[in-house]
Regions:
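Hydrophobic/aromatic beta-strand patches that form the interior of the parallel beta-sheet core
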Residues: 12-14, 53, 86, 106, ...
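FAD-binding core/adjacent interface of flavoenzyme oxidoreductases
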Residues: 51-144, 162, 240
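FAD-site-proximal beta/loop scaffold in flavoenzymes
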Residues: 103-133, 224-225, 233-307
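Short, well-ordered coil/turn residues at beta-beta hairpins
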Residues: 70, 88-89, 216, 229, ...
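Short glycine-rich anion-binding loops that position phosphate/pyrophosphate groups of nucleotides
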Residues: 90-93, 156, 245-247
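Beta1-alpha1 glycine-rich phosphate/pyrophosphate-binding loop at the start
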Residues: 1-59, 143-144, 150-193
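A Rossmann-like FAD-binding core segment of flavoenzymes
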Residues: 52-66, 160-267, 271-273
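Short acidic/His/Gly/Ser-rich catalytic and metal-binding motifs that mark active-site loops
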Residues: 20-23, 94-97, 249, 286-290
Length: 307
């Protein structure tokens, strides 16, 4: 743009954090395959020729072409004018539809989530190594992942590896006592991928000792158990939810073309019925130029597909 407009352009990026987290690497951080710093990049280092503002977007006024933000320690509202706007607000987590899930499930959205999950798994192993109660030990050594998308598949594989590597330090835990379960409500995992690749992933996970349950959802959960839609009661102290994505609250109240809370764009990423607004990432419904095997007409909201 600077070349085309001969430097008569000002670009500003607004983000809640001053760093970028590559979410597909969070399972590796949780599993210890990579360090946290490998999944994080400072925005000012990545993008040096634009203005970066650490702030939270509150609302967008299309008529007046302004964005209202909260910034600073006192979170004072500020109104920013724009000529052109790119919306990349991603998605939020909403686990409230399933009783108990919001209160008891771990998630995989942020760097802190990955660190928390790793610490939680180690704590469960520590507890299982010393307890004399069989039921408590069973719950501590049962790890349940909900969701068979990219995040769920990567997470379940990484935590299984972490547990397997750690067992040599816990003499009172046998490998046969470990149970790692993946629950997927659909009839297959990795719906974003061709069926052949999904089947390959399933076989790999099964060989590593992961138990996959398809066509199975969650009815409710507590801090000590999970009840599936088939009626099975799983004694578990670890529930990891990679489901429950919901639209950004900012987009929900923005009067613009949407489908299930995601912004409708054309193949140039321009928002429908607008001239100066674009949208990218999780919050956009992006049409595909070609339809690969087993895919819908729209691109899945995953970084892997974008790359």
């Amino acid at each position: 743009l600077k070349k085309l407009l001969k430097n008569k352009v000002s670009i500003e990026l607004i983000n809640k954090e001053n760093y970028f987290v590559f979410q597909p690497l969070l399972p590796e951080v949780a599993g210890g395959s990579i360090s946290a710093q490998n999944a994080v990049s400072p925005l000012r280092f990545l993008i040096r020729d634009i203005k970066i503002r650490k702030a939270e977007v509150e609302s967008i006024d299309r008529e007046n072409q302004t964005v209202t933000i909260f910034q600073g320690v006192q979170r004072r509202p500020t109104h920013l004018q724009y000529d052109h706007l790119v919306i990349a607000l991603g998605s939020d987590s909403d686990l409230s539809r399933t009783p108990g899930l919001q209160e008891h499930a771990l998630t995989m959205k942020t760097l802190e989530d990955a660190r928390k999950l790793r610490a939680h798994i180690i704590e469960r192993l520590e507890h299982a190594d010393i307890t004399q109660l069989p039921e408590v030990k069973e719950g501590a050594l049962t790890f349940t992942v909900i969701g068979g998308g990219f995040s769920g598949i990567e997470t379940v594989g990484e935590i299984k590896d972490l547990i397997d590597r750690s067992l040599k330090y816990y003499p009172n835990i046998k490998a046969s006592e470990i149970r790692v379960v993946l629950l997927e409500f659909a009839d297959r995992v990795l719906n974003e991928m061709p069926a052949s690749l999904a089947e390959y992933a399933v076989e790999k996970l099964k060989k590593r000792g992961v138990e996959l349950q398809l066509n199975v959802g969650v009815s409710e959960c507590t801090g000590t158990q999970l009840v599936t839609t088939t009626g099975e009661v799983i004694n578990t102290r670890t529930i990891i939810a990679t489901i429950g994505n919901s639209p950004s609250p900012v987009i929900k109240k923005f009067p613009i073309a949407q489908e299930n809370g995601r912004i409708l764009v054309d193949q140039n990423l321009k928002v429908k019925e607008t001239d100066n607004i674009w949208s990218i990432g999780d919050c956009a419904v992006i049409p595909l130029t070609e339809k690969p095997e087993g895919r819908d007409d729209f691109a899945p909201p995953t970084a892997q597909f974008a790359v």
